[in-house]
């Protein structure tokens, strides 16, 4: 892979679900037989950084989601601290490029599903202090922030009133907004209400695979026109 990646490039995996396996006690510093990512294979593949997904299952209550998110964040810190010879946290682009100069893989944190925010922006502030740098607003179920792409009947018709507050506060804090898993209406609300570009951290093309998790050509063009980017998802069903 080295011939593809120059020293000027920064190769980023924008959504890595491997942290869920940290709860089982795996060591990312060693080659794993399960999963797709560990620090050994990331280095071999020329990956400069990855966003570890702090994922809370949609069936969790808000209280359960908070406890799960904090536990998973703690495990991510343990994993990076225990492999400081190969990895380091990055909370800004500058830190990421500095890590690359040092030969270290950057680990970013992104929260997948906003349920752990509950209905209190103080939780969002706390997660930002913990290192969260993007927020995937929902998963495969509506929540207190917005409508998901999966249930057919909408609850909010896009962002909820609290969801609009979350968008504004993420803009202020510097947390990127991720439209993956969101309904089409939520996507367009994000473009309308966010003052910063929106990302799709793990979405694919609806024209190639007609699945509600994917984005239409029009949505992809509108995202690009608003300065956003999409990272293609390699999940087979999409």
What do these predicted regions represent?
Residues 1-156, 210-238:
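N-terminal hydrophobic targeting/anchoring segments and the immediately downstream early-domain regions
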Residues 161-238:
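Catalytic pocket-lining loop regions of alpha/beta-barrel enzymes
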């Amino acid at each position: 892979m080295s011939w593809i990646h120059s020293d000027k490039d920064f190769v980023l995996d924008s959504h890595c679900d491997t942290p869920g396996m940290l709860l089982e006690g795996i060591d990312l510093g060693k080659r794993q037989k399960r999963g797709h990512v560990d620090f050994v294979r990331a280095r071999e593949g020329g990956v400069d950084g990855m966003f570890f997904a702090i994922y809370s299952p949609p069936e969790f209550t808000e209280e359960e989601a908070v406890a799960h998110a904090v536990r998973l964040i703690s495990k991510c810190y343990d994993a990076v601290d225990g492999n400081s010879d190969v990895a380091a946290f990055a909370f800004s682009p500058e830190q990421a490029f500095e890590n690359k100069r040092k030969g270290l893989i950057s680990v970013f944190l992104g929260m997948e599903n906003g349920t752990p925010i509950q209905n209190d922006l103080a939780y969002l502030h706390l997660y930002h202090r913990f290192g969260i740098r993007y927020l995937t607003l929902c998963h495969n179920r509506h929540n207190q922030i917005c409508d998901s792409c999966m249930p057919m009947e909408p609850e909010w018709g896009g962002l909820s009133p609290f969801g609009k507050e979350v968008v504004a506060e993420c803009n202020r804090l510097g947390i990127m907004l991720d439209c993956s898993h969101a309904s089409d209406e939520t996507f367009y609300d994000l473009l309308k209400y966010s003052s910063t570009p929106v990302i799709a951290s793990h979405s694919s093309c609806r024209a190639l695979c007609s699945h509600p998790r994917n984005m239409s050509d029009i949505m992809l063009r509108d995202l690009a026109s608003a300065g956003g980017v999409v990272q293609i998802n390699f999940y087979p069903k999409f």
